[in-house]
Structures are given as structure tokens and as C-alpha cells.
């Protein structure tokens, strides 16, 4: 029997449908069939509809692209157990308590989830680049469960104030390649924008190491705002930023604590997917 393949033009219409829509079943069945025929492991992530929809939505229901993304996701997790095999919150609690990472309370005008990372709160003498990477992976595994995030993707703000040589030394070519893989075609989230602020001159050497591994689409979505960033950042994220970045209603401390609490409450789920993929 010929395998159904969604036409790219149908992607936006299918993306807007709820998980239980019968119109999604052909794509789900076809992707599940490919995964089973290829012997994709059923643990720790069974091939449920909700799991497979992440990959279909991330590639606008193009079956071939969704299948490639699914394969790359398993390949990346299998090849990076130092990051992906331990997603227990306790593995990153120190970074969370330091205020390194928070998630904005509201989405941006396009519906994207907005994440903030503050390099000054990463002590490279205490936490490795893999620890920092694991923070992003844990957040990604949690927010990818949200249908609206599957549809509208994410945007990330990196505050690079405090970036030092000790941070740069942690980003080896191997780490750079793993970062690029997740940003491009190894995780079922649409990366809609990467915003860098307070970037020092010494950061550009690290960025030049990561850049060759990025797709042109991702490169086009990277915005460097410099030190005088507030006006340009507010244009992208009006009315949703914390006080430190030009907002009016809440602080970074507030959202860091809120997100830390959410991660800790999600410990059972994170533990359930914290297995090495063979």
C-alpha cells in the first residue's frame, strides 16, 4: 500500500488541528510505521500520537522531514548520554538556583515561547557546558508537550554579560557541534529566533565555531543586539519582558523561581524519559 504523504501546502492547516482530529491520523500512522520498521526503541519514549505529533508539527506535516527529524532525535540522544541520559532536576538544581534560566510568562506576538539565559549566572568552575546544555534540554522536553509551542516554536534570549575566557574554553568543537545539531534538525521544536545581548568581543570566536554547523535559516534568525539592546529587544518582545530588560511587571528573579518550581514539579516525567537510548 502506498504511504500517505502530506502535501507541504497542507501543513499549516494540519498544524492548526487539535490532537484528536481524524485528519491527522494518516500522517501519524505513516510516521509510526516507518519508526517501527526501522526498529526505533520504544523506551523511554513510546510512539504515542502525542509524541509523534511533535515531529510532524515541527516539520509542518512533511512526512519525510518529520521522519528525518525523529531519526536525528534518537541519534542525538544516543550519542550524547552525558547530556540526555540524566534529565533529573537535581542534576541542574544549582544552575537553576543561581538564576541562570527562566521562561517568560507570556508568549510573544507570534505565539512563540520565550526563554532567557543569563551567562553571568553560570560559574564555569562549578558547572560544565554539559550541565548548561542539560538545562536547555530539560526545558525543551517540558515545553514541547505544549501544543501551542509545537505550532509556534520558541525564541531564546541569551544575555552574554559576564562572558569570560573560562566560559569560552568549555565550548569545544564537539560541544559546538552538539549545540548546532539541536538548533537545526535534532529536536522537535521550531527555533524562531535567537537574540544575543551584551555580547563581548571574545564571544565572537565561539560563535564563529558554532556558525558553520548551522543552517542558513537558523543563521538568518540570529539577532545581535549589543549593549544598547533595550529598544530593539522591546520591538521583538513588547510587554512581556522582565524589569531588567525593559519590562514593567516582574523581575528575572520571579520567573527564574517560577520556572525552577515547574521543573521540580515535573520530576516524575523527567525521570521517566531519563534513560540512555541505545
Curated annotation (Swiss-Prot):
Q: Which GO terms describe its biological process?
A: embryonic placenta development; intermembrane lipid transfer; lipid metabolic process; negative regulation of establishment of blood-brain barrier; positive regulation of amyloid-beta clearance; response to toxic substance; vitamin E metabolic process; vitamin transport
Binding-site list for a 1,2-diacyl-sn-glycero-3-phospho-(1D-myo-inositol-4,5-bisphosphate): 208-211
Q: Which SMART domains match?
A: CRAL_TRIO_N, SEC14
Q: Which UniProt keywords apply?
A: Cytoplasm, Disease variant, Lipid-binding, Transport
Give the residue ranges for region: Disordered. 1-20
Compositionally biased, Polar residues: which spans?
A: 1-12
Q: Where is the signal peptide?
A: none
Enumerate the Gene3D superfamilies for this protein. Alpha-tocopherol transfer, CRAL-TRIO lipid binding domain, N-terminal domain of phosphatidylinositol transfer protein sec14p
Which molecular-function annotations from GO does this UniProt entry contain?
lipid transfer activity; phosphatidylinositol bisphosphate binding; phosphatidylinositol-3,4-bisphosphate binding; phosphatidylinositol-4,5-bisphosphate binding; vitamin E binding
Q: Which disease is it linked to?
A: Ataxia with vitamin E deficiency: An autosomal recessive disease characterized by undetectable or markedly reduced plasma levels of vitamin E, spinocerebellar degeneration, ataxia, areflexia and proprioception loss.
Function (record text): Binds alpha-tocopherol, enhances its transfer between separate membranes, and stimulates its release from liver cells. Binds both phosphatidylinositol 3,4-bisphosphate and phosphatidylinositol 4,5-bisphosphate; the resulting conformation change is important for the release of the bound alpha-tocopherol.
Q: What is this protein called?
A: Alpha-tocopherol transfer protein
Its source organism is Homo sapiens
Amino acid at each position: 500500500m502506498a504511504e500517505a504523504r502530506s502535501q507541504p501546502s497542507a501543513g499549516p492547516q494540519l498544524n492548526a488541528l487539535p490532537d484528536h482530529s481524524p485528519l491527522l491520523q494518516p500522517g501519524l500512522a505513516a510516521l509510526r510505521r516507518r519508526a517501527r520498521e526501522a526498529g526505533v526503541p520504544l523506551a523511554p519514549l513510546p510512539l504515542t500520537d502525542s509524541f509523534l505529533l511533535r515531529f510532524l508539527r515541527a516539520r509542518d506535516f512533511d512526512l519525510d522531514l518529520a521522519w528525518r527529524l525523529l531519526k536525528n532525535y534518537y541519534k542525538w540522544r544516543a550519542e550524547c548520554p552525558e547530556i540526555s541520559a540524566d534529565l533529573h532536576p537535581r542534576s541542574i538544581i544549582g544552575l537553576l538556583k543561581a538564576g541562570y534560566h527562566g521562561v517568560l510568562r507570556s508568549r510573544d506576538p507570534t505565539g512563540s515561547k520565550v526563554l532567557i539565559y543569563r551567562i553571568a549566572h553560570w560559574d564555569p568552575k562549578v558547572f560544565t557546558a554539559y550541565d548548561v546544555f542539560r538545562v536547555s534540554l530539560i526545558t525543551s522536553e517540558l515545553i514541547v508537550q505544549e501544543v501551542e509551542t509545537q505550532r509556534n516554536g520558541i525564541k531564546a534570549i541569551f544575555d552574554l554579560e559576564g562572558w569570560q575566557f573560562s566560559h569560552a574554553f568549555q565550548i569545544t568543537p564537539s560541544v559546538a557541534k552538539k549545540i548546532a545539531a539541536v538548533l537545526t534538525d535534532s529536536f522537535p521544536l521550531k527555533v524562531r529566533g535567537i537574540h544575543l545581548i551584551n555580547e563581548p568581543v571574545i564571544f565572537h570566536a565561539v560563535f564563529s565555531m558554532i556558525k558553520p554547523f548551522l543552517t542558513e535559516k537558523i543563521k538568518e534568525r540570529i539577532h545581535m543586539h549589543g549593549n544598547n539592546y533595550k529598544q530593539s529587544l522591546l520591538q521583538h518582545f513588547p510587554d512581556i519582558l522582565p524589569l531588567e530588560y525593559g519590562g514593567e511587571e516582574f523581575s528575572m528573579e520571579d520567573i527564574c523561581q517560577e520556572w525552577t518550581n515547574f521543573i521540580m514539579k515535573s520530576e516524575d516525567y523527567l525521570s521517566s524519559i531519563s534513560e540512555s537510548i541505545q
